[in-house]
């Protein structure tokens, strides 16, 4: 993710093609990077079955912690896919307080627990320290459902299970 990664890799790929070189590893890198965004939505759909009408909270909107940069942020692509599927989306990010008009349907919470209030599932998208350090018991108390999709593999499966949450990571 991030604003430059895809553009930089695509530039390298194009340069290679100009010289008659097929950079299959670069093409695969682009495909995998873009596919991770769809993976989060697929995991939600696998667990929840139907996304229409489901309430989903996205934790972390920027492409990485420590920035306010939303250019090519995975969270925005995930939000777009969820909205298209008919989900109701809320979000929280420590520095993002407002999204562009395109994402007017996304409710921005004042904190992670506010964004997660009465949701069916939470998706950790960006590993901000305050989001990776979230209290699983407090999170579960405000949620309607118990599903947490951890796209950063930052959470402890044991701690989340002890709090009554079903944690789904990436790569497992």
Regions found by a protein language model. Give the residues of each.
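Structural/interface elements that position substrates and couple domains in central-metabolism enzymes
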Residues: 1-172
């Amino acid at each position: 993710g991030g604003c430059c990664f895809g553009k930089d890799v695509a530039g390298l790929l194009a340069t290679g093609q100009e010289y008659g070189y097929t950079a299959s590893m670069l093409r695969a890198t682009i495909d995998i990077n873009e596919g991770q965004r769809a993976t989060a939505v697929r995991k939600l759909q696998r667990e929840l079955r139907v996304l229409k009408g489901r309430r989903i909270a996205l934790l972390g909107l920027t492409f990485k912690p420590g920035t306010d940069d939303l250019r090519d942020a995975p969270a925005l692509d995930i939000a777009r896919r969820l909205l298209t599927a008919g989900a109701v989306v809320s979000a929280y990010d420590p520095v993002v307080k407002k999204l562009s008009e395109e994402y007017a349907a996304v409710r921005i919470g004042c904190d992670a627990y506010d964004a997660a209030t009465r949701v069916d599932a939470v998706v950790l998208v960006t590993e901000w320290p305050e989001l990776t350090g979230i209290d699983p018991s407090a999170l579960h108390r405000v949620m309607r459902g118990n599903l947490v999709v951890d796209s950063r593999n930052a959470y402890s499966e044991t701690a989340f299970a002890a709090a009554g949450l079903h944690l789904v990571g990436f790569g497992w």
